[in-house]
A protein has these predicted regions:
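Walker A/P-loop NTP-binding motif of AAA+ ATPase domains
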Residues: 1-81
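C-terminal alpha-helical "lid" subdomain
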Residues: 59-147
Length: 147
């Protein structure tokens, strides 16, 4: 955890200690880096009653999320199995962005205003997103950096 964040966290935890147990106040604490939290910070009675870990969606969950985000958008689903296979380890927001970009590809090639996402639109959007994701990973890891 960044050293500058400790005072803020300690202050928040101290304020929580001052609340009466019967107060109608619920705190939801979230982090994507639970590994950085010191267990003793949250271990005091009354601070954290329950911890819930949210994992990345499995194939069935990705299909359900895909259907949810697609809504009533007309789409050729013939390549969906390949998309689901290639999206192992992605978040729900990735899938939402995938559908948004596929719709943009469809809109770019449509003159009559009827939006119909093809399997090629979906594949192109997925390729673009995965390329962006891989480029970001290479940048973060310094791949190709001679120094």
């Amino acid at each position: 955890m960044h050293p500058g964040r400790h005072p803020l966290l300690f202050q928040l935890l101290n304020e929580m200690d001052g609340l009466a147990e019967d107060a109608d106040v619920v705190f939801l604490l979230t982090t994507n880096r639970a590994d950085l939290l010191e267990p003793a910070l949250a271990a005091r009675p009354g601070r954290v009653d329950q911890a819930v870990e949210l994992t990345l969606p499995d194939r069935d969950a990705r299909r359900a999320l895909f259907d949810l985000y697609r809504g009533d958008l007309a789409m050729d689903l013939s390549g969906l199995d390949e998309v689901l296979d290639r999206t192992d380890g992605v978040t729900a927001s990735f899938l939402k962005e995938l559908i948004r970009r596929a719709a943009l590809f469809a809109a770019e090639r449509t003159d009559d205003g009827a939006l119909d996402v093809s399997a090629a639109d979906l594949t192109a959007a997925l390729d673009e997103l995965l390329d962006t994701r891989n480029a970001m990973t290479r940048t973060l890891l310094g791949a190709g950096d001679p120094g």
